[in-house]
């Protein structure tokens, strides 16, 4: 009885949170070949795109896009590969919120942050900037932005420098996950809080929300995913240049998908925290509550869940579970955390359970943690603290294990951790 009442209460709460924003826009289906054609042309694969006359036939266009996805899966080393940027630089400026909703309390918070900055009452922060290898029609989106949280120099000069790239959820404002980065600093781990494509300072002026990251434009969504993945890998390049030796990624929701794909194609990434995880990109968009407006546009064009799954298979983790355990990705050296929620209406629980089973099947070293809430309620009290604890404690232990490994320590699980270390993570 209690369980049923709790579930009903949680689903109602989750639904209220996913429906309170009224600025979601229903957009029609677009195939978006123009968004991925530059990559195909530069790699001698342009023949995969039908002629412009043929693309007027939706059946021909859909079949071609499915074939391109299959091609990108086979050549994912190229698709998620890149030319290393040459314009890495640190920029100082006052942090801004860049809200994605127009609720009065959010706009008031944004105005207050701007006021304090204009009066010199807030400190400037450092941001890593560079040009993304994946180019789009939006110059502001192609200038990558990652807030830099360097950890204090450790007293032991022989201790390896460790860093993590953090990617928040879809439509996150620019302050989301900043507190996690500060916690990692207290563990001696530096952090780059990466703005996803079309998010915060990278968001085109024509948008209120980060709609172009995930939309009814099939090709643009694929391009945004590729851009996010190569941007993560470029961040690791820069960290490597700064003398860092151990690398991790933490992604929430959409950021989790991006983080997984980056790790599956980069052997340097060994610590992996997937906060809300799913199998197929198309399944989440079709079945998730927060993407109802996207599904509406796709459904009006006659698409089905099964067909959408094929159209976005090249950006779906399910296509790369074997890849993440490959020798190329150094899968045997990776450690992973999967966090999912029992009452998730955005990343339905059934898909998260499939992730857990897939990780077991391929032999990835991982641990799973379950939250007694939903997707959006993860950001509410007390669940945000539970989620933060799971992620922080895992990241702390995983990086500690890498340090011990470097000292020749046994790779078996560590014994009970001293209370002082537990307190460090709790703070």
Each language-model region and where it sits:
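N-terminal targeting or regulatory segments adjacent to alpha/beta-hydrolase or S9 domains
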Residues: 1-128, 412-427
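Proline/glycine-enriched tight loop/beta-turn segments at coil->beta junctions
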Residues: 138-143, 151-163, 186, 331-333
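Cap/lid segment of the alpha/beta-hydrolase catalytic domain
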Residues: 166-227
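Hydrolase active-site cap/lid region
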Residues: 260-307
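Alpha/beta-hydrolase fold nucleophile elbow
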Residues: 240-253
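The feature captures the conserved acid-bearing segment of alpha/beta-hydrolase catalytic domains
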Residues: 287-351
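C-terminal catalytic histidine-bearing segment of alpha/beta-hydrolase fold enzymes
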Residues: 353-427
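Glycine-rich nucleophile elbow surrounding the catalytic serine of serine-hydrolase chemistry
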Residues: 251-263
């Amino acid at each position: 009885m209690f369980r049923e009442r709790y579930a009903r209460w949680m689903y109602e709460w989750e639904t209220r949170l996913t429906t309170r924003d009224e600025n979601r826009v229903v957009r029609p289906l677009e195939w978006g070949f123009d968004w991925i054609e530059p990559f195909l042309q530069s790699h001698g694969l342009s023949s995969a795109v039908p002629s412009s006359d043929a693309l007027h036939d939706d059946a021909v266009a859909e079949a071609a896009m499915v074939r391109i996805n299959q091609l990108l899966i086979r050549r994912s080393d190229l698709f998620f590969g890149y030319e290393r940027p040459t314009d890495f630089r640190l920029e100082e400026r006052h942090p801004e919120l860049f809200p994605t909703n127009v609720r009065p309390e959010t706009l008031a918070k944004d105005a207050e942050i701007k006021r304090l900055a204009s009066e010199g009452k807030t400190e400037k922060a450092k941001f890593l900037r560079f040009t993304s290898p994946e180019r789009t029609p939006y110059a502001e989106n192609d200038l990558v932005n990652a807030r830099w949280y360097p950890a204090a120099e450790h007293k032991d000069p022989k201790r390896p420098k460790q860093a993590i790239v953090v990617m928040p959820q879809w439509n996150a404002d620019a302050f989301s996950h900043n507190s996690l980065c500060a916690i990692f600093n207290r563990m001696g781990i530096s952090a780059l809080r990466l703005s996803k494509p079309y998010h915060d300072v990278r968001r085109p002026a024509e948008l209120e929300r980060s709609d172009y990251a995930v939309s009814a434009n099939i090709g643009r969504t694929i391009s945004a995913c590729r851009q996010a993945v190569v941007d993560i890998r470029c961040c690791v390049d820069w960290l490597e240049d700064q003398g860092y030796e151990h690398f991790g990624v933490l992604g929430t929701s959409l950021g989790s998908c991006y983080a997984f794909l980056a790790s599956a194609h980069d052997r340097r990434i060994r610590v992996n925290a997937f906060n809300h995880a799913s199998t197929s990109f198309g399944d989440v968009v079709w079945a998730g509550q927060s993407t109802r407006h996207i599904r509406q546009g796709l459904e009006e064009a006659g698409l089905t869940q099964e067909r959408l799954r094929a159209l976005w298979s090249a950006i779906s983790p399910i296509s790369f579970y074997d890849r993440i355990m490959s020798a190329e990705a150094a899968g045997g050296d990776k450690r992973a955390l999967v966090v999912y929620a029992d009452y998730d209406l955005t990343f339905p629980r059934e898909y998260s359970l499939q992730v857990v089973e897939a990780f077991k099947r391929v032999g990835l070293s991982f641990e799973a943690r379950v939250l007694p809430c939903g997707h959006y309620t993860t950001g509410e009290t007390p669940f945000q603290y539970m989620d933060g604890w799971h992620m922080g404690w895992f990241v702390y232990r995983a990086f500690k294990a890498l340090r011990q490994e470097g000292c020749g320590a046994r790779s078996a699980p560590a014994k009970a951790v001293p209370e002082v270390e537990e307190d460090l993570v709790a703070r």
